[in-house]
Amino acid sequence: MLALGKLLELTLAGREPAEKTQLTVEGVRMRWMGEGALEVRPPQVRDNGTDLLLSAGIHGNETAPIELLDELIRSIARGDLKPRARILFLFGNPDAMRRGTRFVEQDVNRLFNGRHEQSGGAEALRACELEHLAASFFSLPDRYRLHYDLHTAIRGSKIEQFALYPWKEGRQHSRLELARLRAAGMSAVLLQNKPSIVFSAYTYDQLGAEAFTLELGKARPFGQNQQVNLAPLRLRLEQIIEGREPELDENLEELQLFSVAREVIKRTDAFTFNLADAVENFSPLEKGYVLAEDAGGSRWVVEEDGARIIFPNPKVKNGLRAGILIVPTDAGSLG
């Protein structure tokens, strides 16, 4: 197998490859673009016009998606997987991956769409670097741009695998893309309705890609992801990579759709959630329930019918989102 097929090993060891560019037996060019970054380019005669960005490890302890990308890269390097798409593989936060932690100083996935310019430190620089890598990759005109940013969650979830679909003024969410997510094993999609500072929001908003954050189960250490079923996602990614994706059924009846009702923002150190520490994502909330409290008598009271909570995290820094209140929605507004 080609040495560049061992991108994960190189990244975890903090080493550069001796050869920055290698060709597979199929004539596929693999090019090391920097730490944790590998571009894969098929021969021109096989290129089908798709640019696929696959990122994982934005949070260093979310290992199941990192292992999935490692398997795909190795399959390409061996010649088992024969790309017709251009692909950029990114391991988002190598320092945190090496430490087995979510981040070192700052959450990289809160530093996109201009936020890194307001901050400092190694992780702000990494967010800037990831933006530049993505912008360069998606710079070719007249191509189909797709980005999946793969994650696992801090906590358990009543819906184990789900996606977050970014928002941009004047742009509709795509029914076809939702059908693709359903085929890839996602059971629910959160349709966002305001700008965001995560990686997929940057590529969606600034680079014109169809972009998604995929949550694939609970975060576990390397080698302990046997309970995370990524087979449907892996199959769909292999089909996209090889240009053999079956026709998609745009019937979305089996896909649960949600929209954002409100974001819960932590203002001060006095912030508290009135939730059990082990509360799961998508847990239902009764109308009138006092969800959270902060200094000065500030309270978050559930006003919405059918409300649920996702990503509750009272440990975030002041000024950041500590959770999201979501409500069911339908496919009526889709493009």
Swiss-Prot record:
Coiled-coil ranges (or none): none
Cofactor(s) the record lists: Zn(2+)
Catalytic residues (UniProt): E215
Chain sites annotated for binding Zn(2+): H59, E62, H151
EC number(s) reported in the record: 3.5.1.96
One of the GO BP terms on file: arginine catabolic process to glutamate
Catalytic activity entry: N-succinyl-L-glutamate + H2O = L-glutamate + succinate
Gene3D superfamilies noted in UniProt: Zn peptidases
InterPro entries in alphabetical order: AspA/AstE_fam, AstE_AspA_cat, Aste_AspA_hybrid_dom, SuccinylGlu_desuccinylase
Keyword presence, Hydrolase: yes
Record's keyword terms, sorted: Arginine metabolism, Hydrolase, Metal-binding, Zinc
Pfam families per record: AstE_AspA_cat (PF24827), AstE_AspA_hybrid (PF04952)
Protein's UniProt keywords contain Zinc: yes
Leader sequence residues: none
Family affiliation: Belongs to the AspA/AstE family. Succinylglutamate desuccinylase subfamily.
Function: Transforms N(2)-succinylglutamate into succinate and glutamate.
Protein name, per record: Succinylglutamate desuccinylase
Organism: Pseudomonas savastanoi pv. phaseolicola (strain 1448A / Race 6) (Pseudomonas syringae pv. phaseolicola (strain 1448A / Race 6))
